[in-house]
Amino acid sequence: MPTETTPRFRIRQCAARLQAGGVVAYPTEAVYGLGCDPGDPAAVATLLTLKRRDPGKGLILIASRVSQLSPWLGDAPLPQAVLASWPGPNTWLLPAAPHTPAWITGGRAKVAVRVTAHPVAAALCEAFGGAIVSTSANRDGQPPARSATQVRTRLGAEAAELADILPGPVDRSARPTAIRDAESGAVIRA
């Protein structure tokens, strides 16, 4: 799944950084994302500090395949509408597994998840071996980064210390991914 601008060895390096508790910036369908191991509270704290994000907002998890999301989801079968929309730019709120930490759910009973169609983001999840956190690479409330250069600009000097930046293209025509509640059908973000 590597692209011309994202060599396989860089994907492996960034996956190793995630496994070691680090934070990585990487391209997604619409913007650059910040990611970390969702099961590592120190890594999530670093990401939230870098982004200056309120932990009560919760975080999105992305994966390269549905099975990578299973540890974070409740036991109910996934609705057909969810499965039919993946891989793709569709994030769904689904019932969280009882052990899913509050730093991922924002203290709610649901978790936001997506199976990404972006080749670099999917390759990163594969190399990491599971789902990763995905939140836009910018300070909370600021415009999202759409290039590696913008990641450095938006996050400032801390970006060099806290985040490895994985090169690769984003779809410049794409809007941020839609977020919908799978149970109610409510559109959270169009």
UniProtKB/Swiss-Prot annotation:
- Pull one GO CC term from this UniProt entry: cytoplasm
Give the Enzyme Commission number: 2.7.7.87
GO process terms (BP): regulation of translational fidelity; tRNA threonylcarbamoyladenosine modification
Protein's cellular compartments: Cytoplasm
Q: Boundaries of each YrdC-like domain copy? A: 8-190
Pfam families reported for this sequence: Sua5_yciO_yrdC
| Gene Ontology molecular function, alphabetical | ATP binding; double-stranded RNA binding; L-threonylcarbamoyladenylate synthase; tRNA binding
Its UniProt entry gives the catalysed reaction(s) as: L-threonine + hydrogencarbonate + ATP = L-threonylcarbamoyladenylate + diphosphate + H2O
- Which keywords does this Swiss-Prot/TrEMBL entry list? ATP-binding, Cytoplasm, Nucleotide-binding, Nucleotidyltransferase, Transferase, tRNA processing
Q: Write out the function statement from the record.
A: Required for the formation of a threonylcarbamoyl group on adenosine at position 37 (t(6)A37) in tRNAs that read codons beginning with adenine. Catalyzes the conversion of L-threonine, HCO(3)(-)/CO(2) and ATP to give threonylcarbamoyl-AMP (TC-AMP) as the acyladenylate intermediate, with the release of diphosphate.
Similarity field: Belongs to the SUA5 family. TsaC subfamily.
Note the HAMAP family from the entry: TsaC
- This protein is called Threonylcarbamoyl-AMP synthase
Organism from which the protein derives: Alkalilimnicola ehrlichii (strain ATCC BAA-1101 / DSM 17681 / MLHE-1)
Q: What is the lineage of its organism?
A: Bacteria, Pseudomonadati, Pseudomonadota, Gammaproteobacteria, Chromatiales
Q: Which gene encodes it?
A: tsaC
